[in-house]
Amino acid sequence: SIAGTFDALSTTAIPHQHGTAIASLIAAHGRLMGSAPDAKILAVRAFDPKDAGAQGTTFNILKSLDWAAAQGARVINMSFAGPTDPAIHRSLEAARKKGIVLVAAAGNAGAKSPPLYPAADPNVIAVSATDADDKLFEQSNRGRHITVAAPGAQILVAIPDNGYEMSSGTSYSAAEVSGIVALMLQRTPDLTPDKVKAILRATAKDLGPRGPDAMFGAGLADAYGAITADVAPVAAAGRRPVERVSTGAR
């Protein structure tokens, strides 16, 4: 499923399981099937692993976004979170205007955290995380910028060296929504980013307080509802290859 790779760092590559996990939720083929198994992955390394986490710079993120756009990515998954950055905002705005759908993890800093970026950027589909009972994942960020929610607690993911593990976080809920978006574009390739966001909101299963809220946005993303939504104009019938998805992974 890997259509291309890009390393924005000048250091020697160190394997990081976060990117493998994200890609597996989108397009895995094996005991674990991704939500969009026909998707072609553009794997990007923009973050330098440091102990348990990873560190990124504005320059490396911008290089990675530019590369993904140049490769024809239709969806960019951004499973990372940090402070607002004007340069990254301009890059995201340009990408959306080119027709690229941008999906980002809300963050795992909890209820008291301010909005984190790029999820809080207006050009982005922001995804919070739910648990097995459709309750908000305790560590998930909240905010009026949340578009939809998706499962993100105790998720089975692939890791390097043919392994699997259970892991939690909004990174995984964002990946699941990126897979849904890839399927939407497979069915209707001419969907715009704004239309994709509108469909996700309109077809989501309402959770929490009635109507949109700061925890779940419009509600739990509904893959079937989003893919089968009545959209005009509808693409010609027939199986189409899923457009390229950049994982934006570490």
Go through the PLM ranges and name each one.
Residues L42, V101-A104, I125-V127, A149, ...:
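Structural detector of well-ordered beta-strand residues that form the stable sheet scaffold
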Residues I146-T147, D222:
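Substrate-binding/active-site groove segments that recognize
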